[in-house]
């Protein structure tokens, strides 16, 4: 899964974003909410955006591209949808609550979670992570980069 979150860390939006939002508010309808022209136009725009993103990320199907309201919702959908009792997950002590809280909850449901500790500088040793892999490890859930 590839997750992109620009809104959380960008103070001011480029003028093009403001113009696109204004245009959407004034002219767009609700996608997939009707057979009238404005709704159909919005639906086409959403589908075209999904198609472009699928191509950009080499995703085989546009319907595999999902839009969510925010990072917490996206992470909850992914984490709760991926793991079940008997699975093993590796994460780190550095993760945001939107990762940690679902993982803690899943531990009460039979999912095993190991956390790689951070050193005093806030770094993890990948060698420590590698020692935690086992046959039932389903994923590593961790931040790749944070600025």
Q: Where do the PLM segments sit?
A:
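Pyridoxal 5′-phosphate
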Residues: 1-147
